[in-house]
């Protein structure tokens, strides 16, 4: 490792390049075979035009995006860090959307400025390396306590804890195995590490104000169920924990808005939800330690969609936009052989053969432990290509073989035409294959490396004693 401000020798790579062991190793390496011209030219045959349906496009869009940053407390002691997570929520309504676009691929800057009035940003401040919060004993406990407090403070009504993100988390956790609407099970106590065996299960009950471990008596927090505290370290960077937390919070916020609408508009929630679509930056998936919550979101949306269908309404509209990755690379490779306006529901077979080149595919389905949405590939009417994700219309993945087949059957997704129409409408020229909702959400949430992060560094230094 270099000293601070020490620069590397500009010719130090020569020893590596000329090392005979390295040369021999590189000679044995070979790339995974590329798609041949026939594979590329025939790929477009799998695409088709989406079927029309009787559902209308929504007038309201909620776009959610987040970013995180680890700020150093002192220049002299850069290993003392505070974590910042910012998740922005933008509400775009029919009139504002038409004003932004103005019939052009270029956005109207004056209309964009007005959108700021409907922008809501949620900030989470979490202790990271070498920082202890309140009366906690170490960084891990500090992270847990701070996260739980901030989930509780994020409320729609300040005097009603039932409107908090924490209550939404409890409801989602109740869908986990061994849990119900009155109690949830945590994987293990963060202090004594008991709870993993059948005879020492640890529950947190709905009305517990200050739950404690029955084995060691230490304080537990509802947010412990997310397990994002597990990789938190005292003396190393905690960017992994911050990233996992941001990922699950973005998706949990969408569910929180849905729950709020359902519970506060008991007579008209179906009409409201039918006229609303959530845009989420990234796939509909939960990664890392909280991954099991993908199944909770899947079950909740399935149950709600059953009610929506009984009322002759569209399924909940939620779309994850994937801006990069292997599927995007594949789509860009074959896009010239796809007609404008055509869409494809990606199967595991095609993914394994042409995207991941997995010749020994497992019996499990792609994203079994993480995804609650299906990948679609689309070339819009302007010729731009998008990889997007929509919720699975199934309750669970228990019958893997059947799920693997049915998830890639486009006929199971009743509102694909709505999604493709939205991708036509919101296409903009600000970035390559950019969409207005995701661009705006990122605009108001991104913590830029400078000057945004510099401000957070200064804030951390001035507030911590």
Report residues per predicted region.
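Two-metal-ion RNase H-like nuclease active-site motif
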Residues: 60-67
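Long, contiguous domain-sized segments
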Residues: 1-59, 113-465
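Alpha-helical structural signal
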Residues: 54, 67-69
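Acidic, metal-ligating active-site segments
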Residues: 72-131
């Amino acid at each position: 490792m270099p000293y601070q401000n020490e620069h590397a020798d500009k010719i130090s790579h020569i020893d590596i390049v000329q090392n005979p062991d390295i040369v021999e190793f590189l000679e044995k390496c070979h790339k995974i075979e590329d798609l041949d011209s026939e594979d590329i030219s025939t790929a477009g045959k799998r695409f088709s035009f989406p079927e029309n349906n009787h559902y209308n496009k929504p007038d309201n869009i909620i776009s959610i995006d987040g970013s995180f940053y680890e700020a150093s407390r002192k220049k002299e002691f850069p290993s003392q860090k505070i974590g910042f997570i910012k998740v922005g929520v933008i509400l775009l309504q029919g009139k504002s959307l038409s004003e932004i676009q103005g019939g052009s691929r270029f956005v109207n800057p004056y209309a964009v400025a007005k959108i700021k009035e409907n922008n809501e940003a949620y900030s989470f401040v979490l202790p990271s390396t070498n920082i202890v919060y309140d009366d906690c004993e170490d960084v891990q406990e500090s992270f847990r306590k701070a996260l739980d407090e901030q989930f509780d403070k994020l409320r729609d009504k300040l005097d009603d804890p039932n409107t908090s993100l924490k209550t939404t988390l409890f409801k989602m956790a109740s869908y986990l195995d061994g849990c119900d609407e009155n109690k949830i099970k945590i994987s293990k106590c963060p202090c004594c590490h008991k709870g993993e065996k059948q005879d020492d299960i640890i529950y947190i009950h709905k009305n517990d104000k200050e739950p404690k471990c029955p084995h060691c008596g230490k304080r537990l927090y509802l947010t412990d169920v997310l397990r994002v505290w597990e990789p938190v370290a005292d003396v190393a960077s905690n960017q992994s924990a911050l990233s996992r937390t941001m990922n699950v919070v973005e998706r949990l916020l969408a569910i929180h808005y849905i729950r709020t609408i359902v519970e506060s508009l008991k007579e008209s929630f179906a009409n409201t939800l039918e006229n609303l679509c959530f845009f989420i930056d990234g796939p509909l998936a939960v990664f890392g330690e909280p991954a099991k919550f993908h199944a909770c979101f899947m079950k909740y949306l399935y149950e709600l969609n059953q009610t929506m269908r009984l009322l002759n309404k569209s399924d909940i509209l939620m779309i994850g936009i994937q801006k990069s990755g292997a599927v995007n690379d594949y789509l860009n490779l074959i896009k010239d052989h796809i007609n404008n306006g055509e869409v494809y529901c990606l199967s595991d077979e095609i993914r394994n053969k042409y995207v991941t080149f997995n010749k020994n595919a497992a019996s499990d389905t792609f994203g079994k432990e993480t995804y609650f949405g299906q990948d679609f590939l689309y070339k819009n009417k302007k010729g731009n290509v998008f990889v997007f994700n929509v919720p699975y219309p199934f309750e669970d993945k228990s019958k893997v073989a059947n799920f693997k087949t049915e998830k890639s059957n486009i006929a199971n997704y009743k509102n694909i035409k709505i999604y493709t129409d939205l991708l036509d409408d919101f296409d903009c020229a600000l970035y390559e294959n950019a969409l207005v909702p995701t661009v705006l959400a990122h605009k108001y949430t991104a913590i830029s490396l400078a000057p945004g992060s510099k401000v957070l560094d200064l804030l951390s230094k001035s507030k911590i004693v």
